[in-house]
């Protein structure tokens, strides 16, 4: 059975590597094959593989067809304003007058949904709506604009689309201010009532949001500064309600109910009608059931988040086997947990938190098994101390590959932080936090006092974490290469520790740590050298000295048109050297494309310094992220024309100027005058290696295109390019047929937002390129577009089709 369970789980994982979700007919074939394999003893395990794969893909099929099953047209949905009815199913996050929440759609324009689905809405309340306080459980009629679930698609960036799918959210949108917005029912869920009461009684304190995270899994109020400390010290896992928290609730409630049952005269306190039936129950079984109910309630308060659900599943299986008298090996218990999660929460496999928690449990089990000889001690206290120490060492080391892969950074002080934080959180802070939650139901004054006490103790721990954060290089940002080095080294160590019998000859070691280290000196040398290489690479900066190129040697370079929505950001790249053309936008809400897209991309590629930053013009969607960029990465030179955003030492982009960078020639073709405010002041640049060329056009209109064509015909400049980055996101005001014919590109790239309100790129413009047999690429459908030039060849890659072609991270739409 263990092999079947393992193959089922592996099949679910393998399904994630497919580029599309097959049609239902193919899935039925998979099921038929699985059944046929199951009835043959030799192939029974393989049946689990196909069933696991089919189950995951079937859930993907259902998600993708949420629109179709309700007879809704995706494209028409995004173009109109709709009136919807439904219920808020999450505690809204609030930022000033901005609310964000998950909404279960029941009706759309009066049409009842065959299968209601979730949408993620934001609602900015106006003065007429200021009396409205959205809450979980409320039913509303709202006027909204929605789009299918979508997110930016770039290397190194956060996949919002995967996150939405993980939460089963099918669409996103916003509420329009309208008189039709009305509250239909004010029935509030118990979770929301307790949350509101808790917030009302919570003392004013910078760390108060951490108590909300520990009690209700609500982390949206945690400040950026607090998150930075948690990340730098590797302690963010302590505020995600998971196995540690549920384990404390389970054990604490079990002990409490057991003491109550044994110490209190229940036969005198309880009515005979209740007490008499209890006599027939085994006391420990009754206590187990009460403990299970208590833990379930805490998981409900945490909204059954993925780490919570994983831990709850493990505990529930343990309780049920105890109650039913079933004996399970540790391995089967773990495999049953994984398969149960795949069955009831299949999209949890898309969550980084799921994999971190699963691997953490595996590491704990393996460590206790492999290092059991180290834990031998006559005194129980020292056995516990040694156990906690070695488990924390193992978790810190063996989770490094996952943390570096998911977050592109590792904490160098996490071991020291967790050695104190874990016991303090486990035995003091979390119990006090939960106690305040319980007392809130009986006495708000006492609950408030416990909250204040918890915050005071938490403040002491916080001072220690701040001390560690202030250490030099407490948090290292890692590139893909550095993450791979870490993964290889840790895998070698894991193999030697948990697999290789030659590493541990327990009879010879006999608790002699010196002998153990002596036998492992080769391995320790590898670890030390690799650590030095990773550290030096992560802290070094790259000088922007131009590389000497042999004229006969082809130059390998890339032009990466990043997916920044309705804006522009292009990275011209050679290895770890890069030039950035435009920065994307920044918005009043604090959302900034430089922080979300550009910096993660540069970090992913080990680019610690930009040789140049070129700003085409000062519109927000092109230059909004410049200030944040200046503050977060070293820049050799900024080329910008608008005086409003220029600084001393910045260069200019003017017709006739050019420069050579890493063997590439950058010819500035426009503007003629130093302005940079309007679209027609955009810095137009032709990049060429002598064989291939790419033309960057900013937001110029047909008027400037005509001037450039005229100059090209007079041999004053060259416009010919292999790839054209279309002007102004493909608007009707640009990309004239005369300009296209003069440039003569073989491919064009549009940088535009997904289903944007301006319908860019315009159909008319796209048709012009199609008529000229020019291949079209667009970031709004394809994600990041990479123009790859190497070995005297040019090829274009799309992120969704070529670089990350996985069904769970992409929409059902077809790629160009």
Kindly give the residue locations of the regions a language model identified.
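Non-globular, low-confidence helical/coil segments that flank catalytic cores
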Residues: 99, 109-111, 129-132, 136-143, ...
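Alpha-helical transmembrane bundle and helix-membrane interface signal
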Residues: 151-153, 259-283, 322-333, 369-381
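Residue-level signal for inorganic ion chemistry
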Residues: 11, 86, 353, 399, ...
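Aromatic-rich juxtamembrane segments at the membrane interface
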Residues: 166-314, 397, 666, 693-698, ...
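N-terminal leader/targeting segments
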Residues: 1-81, 136, 172, 179, ...
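Internal transmembrane alpha-helical bundles of multi-pass membrane proteins
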Residues: 8-9, 295, 299-300, 304-491, ...
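Membrane-interface helix/helix-cap signal primarily in integral membrane proteins
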Residues: 53-237, 591, 596-604, 609, ...
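Membrane-interface micro-motifs in multi-pass membrane enzymes
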Residues: 1-2, 21, 239-247, 283-287, ...
């Amino acid at each position: 059975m263990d092999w079947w369970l393992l193959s089922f789980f592996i099949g679910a994982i393998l399904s994630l590597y497919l580029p599309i979700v097959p049609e239902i007919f193919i899935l039925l074939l998979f099921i038929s094959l699985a059944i046929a394999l199951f009835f043959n003893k030799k192939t029974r395990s393989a049946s689990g593989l196909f069933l696991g794969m089919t189950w995951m893909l079937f859930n993907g099929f259902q998600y993708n067809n949420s629109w179709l099953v309700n007879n809704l047209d995706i494209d028409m949905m995004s173009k109109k304003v709709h009136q919807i009815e439904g219920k808020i199913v999450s505690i809204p996050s609030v930022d000033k007058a901005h609310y964000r929440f998950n909404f279960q759609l029941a009706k759309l324009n009066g049409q009842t949904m065959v299968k209601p689905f979730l949408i993620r809405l934001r609602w900015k309340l106006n003065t007429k709506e200021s009396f409205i306080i959205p809450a979980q459980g409320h039913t509303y009629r709202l006027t909204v604009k929605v789009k299918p679930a979508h997110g930016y698609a770039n290397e190194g960036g956060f996949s919002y689309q995967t996150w939405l799918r993980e939460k089963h959210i099918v669409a996103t949108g916003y509420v329009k201010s309208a008189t039709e917005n009305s509250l239909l029912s004010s029935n509030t869920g118990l979770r929301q009532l307790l949350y509101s009461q808790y917030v009302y009684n919570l003392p004013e304190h910078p760390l108060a949001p951490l108590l909300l995270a520990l009690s209700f899994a609500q982390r949206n109020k945690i400040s950026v500064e607090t998150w930075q400390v948690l990340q730098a010290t590797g302690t963010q896992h302590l505020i995600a309600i998971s196995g540690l928290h549920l384990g404390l609730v389970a054990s604490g409630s079990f002990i409490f109910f057991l003491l109550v049952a044994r110490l209190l005269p229940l036969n005198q306190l309880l009515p005979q009608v209740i007490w008499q039936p209890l006599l027939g129950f085994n006391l420990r079984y009754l206590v187990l059931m009460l403990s299970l109910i208590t833990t379930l309630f805490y998981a409900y308060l945490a909204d059954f988040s993925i780490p919570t659900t994983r831990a709850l599943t493990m505990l529930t299986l343990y309780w049920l086997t105890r109650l039913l008298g079933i004996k399970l090996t540790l391995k089967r218990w773990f495999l049953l947990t994984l398969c149960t999660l795949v069955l009831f929460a299949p999209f949890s496999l898309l969550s980084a938190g799921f994999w971190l928690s699963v691997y953490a449990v595996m590491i704990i089990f393996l460590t206790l098994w492999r290092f059991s000889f180290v834990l031998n001690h006559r005194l129980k206290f020292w056995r516990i101390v040694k156990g906690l120490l070695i488990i924390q060492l193992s978790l810190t080391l063996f989770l490094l590959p996952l943390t570096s892969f998911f977050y592109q950074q590792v904490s160098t002080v996490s071991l020291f932080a967790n050695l104190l934080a874990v016991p303090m959180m486990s035995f003091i802070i979390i119990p006090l936090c939960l106690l305040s939650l319980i007392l809130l139901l009986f006495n708000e004054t006492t609950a408030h006092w416990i909250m204040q006490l918890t915050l005071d103790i938490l403040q002491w721990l916080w001072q220690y974490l701040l001390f560690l954060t202030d250490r030099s290089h407490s948090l290292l940002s890692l590139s893909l290469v550095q993450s791979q080095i870490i993964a290889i080294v840790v895998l070698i160590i894991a193999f030697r520790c948990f697999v290789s019998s030659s590493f541990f000859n327990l009879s010879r070691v006999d608790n002699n740590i010196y002998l153990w280290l002596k036998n492992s000196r080769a391995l320790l040398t590898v670890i030390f050298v690799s650590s030095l290489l990773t550290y030096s690479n992560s802290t070094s900066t790259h000088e922007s000295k131009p590389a000497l190129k042999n004229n006969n040697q082809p130059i390998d370079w890339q032009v990466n048109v990043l997916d920044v929505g309705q804006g522009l950001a292009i990275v011209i790249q050679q290895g770890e050297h890069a030039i950035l053309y435009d920065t994307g936008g920044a918005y009043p809400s604090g959302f900034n494309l430089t922080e979300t897209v550009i910096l993660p991309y540069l970090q992913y590629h080990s680019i610690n310094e930009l040789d140049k930053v070129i700003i085409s013009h000062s519109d927000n969607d092109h230059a909004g992220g410049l200030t944040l960029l200046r503050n977060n990465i070293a820049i050799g030179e900024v080329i910008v024309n608008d005086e409003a955003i220029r600084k001393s030492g910045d260069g200019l982009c003017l017709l006739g100027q050019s420069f050579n960078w890493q063997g590439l020639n950058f010819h500035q073709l426009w503007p003629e005058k130093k302005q940079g405010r309007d679209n027609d002041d955009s810095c137009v640049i032709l990049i060429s290696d002598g064989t291939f060329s790419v033309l960057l056009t900013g937001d110029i209109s047909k008027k400037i295109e005509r001037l450039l064509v005229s100059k090209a015909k007079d041999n004053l400049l060259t416009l010919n390019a292999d790839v054209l980055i279309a002007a102004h996101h493909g608007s009707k005001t640009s990309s004239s047929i005369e300009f296209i014919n003069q440039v003569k590109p073989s491919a064009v790239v549009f940088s535009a937002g997904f289903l944007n309100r301006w319908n860019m790129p315009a159909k008319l413009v796209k048709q012009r390129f199609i008529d000229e047999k020019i291949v079209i690429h667009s970031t709004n459908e394809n994600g990041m577009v990479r123009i790859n030039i190497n070995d005297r060849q040019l090829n274009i890659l799309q992120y969704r089709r070529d670089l990350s072609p996985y069904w769970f991270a992409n929409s059902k739409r077809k790629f160009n």
